[in-house]
A protein has these predicted regions:
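Hydrophobic, aromatic-enriched alpha-helical segments typical of multi-pass transmembrane helices
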Residues: 2-187
Length: 187
């Protein structure tokens, strides 16, 4: 007899939502430190840790802790979306991580990572809504950071111009709220 997933045993919400919330908070602290003009190694390492936690959240949201079904249920497309989201943040973390250790990688890997996290985030948001594994606002809210990430990548690539760090700050806060909603989900 197999055990059913209950509201207190859905590990995708605990590990995926928790990692997304923790990664967003680390990234937000790094942005605040940079805005205060105190950047340096602390903000670099906080950003790397935040990106690694956000990468882990993508994998946990896709597969749960045990490799079964995550927030997208059994949807292969949804799993691929959240894996692409995770790989995107992993690439964005590896470049500054290796640079801090003295190894230079092409900067285009960050662009590839950003595109992967946007495409994966949009696919993951659509499938999350369709499958209905997440309930309430957690079911639809992930679409907000996915769209904000799309705008962020468009500004990063120079397609549109939005000055300052306001867009990335909004993106980080949106990821934090999405992580919190996943974490507190009642499914």
């Amino acid at each position: 007899m197999t055990a059913r997933v209950r509201k207190d045993s859905a590990n995708w919400r605990i590990f995926g939502g928790g990692a997304m919330l923790a990664g967003s908070v680390a990234w937000l602290i790094a942005l605040l430190i940079q805005a205060a003009g105190q950047g340096g190694e602390i903000s670099t390492w906080l950003t790397i840790i935040g990106f690694l936690l956000l990468a882990a959240s993508g994998f946990f949201l896709a597969f749960g802790q045990t490799g079964s079904n995550g927030v997208v249920g059994g949807s292969v497309l949804g799993k691929l979306g959240f894996v692409a989201f995770g790989v995107g943040f992993l690439l964005m973390a590896i470049v500054p991580l290796l640079a801090a250790l003295g190894v230079a990688l092409p900067g285009e890997l960050v662009t590839v990572g950003a595109i992967l996290l946007v495409v994966g985030g949009i696919v993951g948001a659509i499938v999350t809504y369709q499958k209905g594994v997440a309930r309430g606002s957690a079911r639809w809210f992930f679409a907000i950071p996915a769209v904000v990430a799309l705008i962020w990548v468009a500004t990063t690539l120079g397609w549109i111009a939005i000055g300052g760090n306001i867009l990335v700050t909004i993106l980080v806060i949106a990821y934090a709220v999405a992580g919190l909603l996943f974490l507190l989900n009642r499914r």
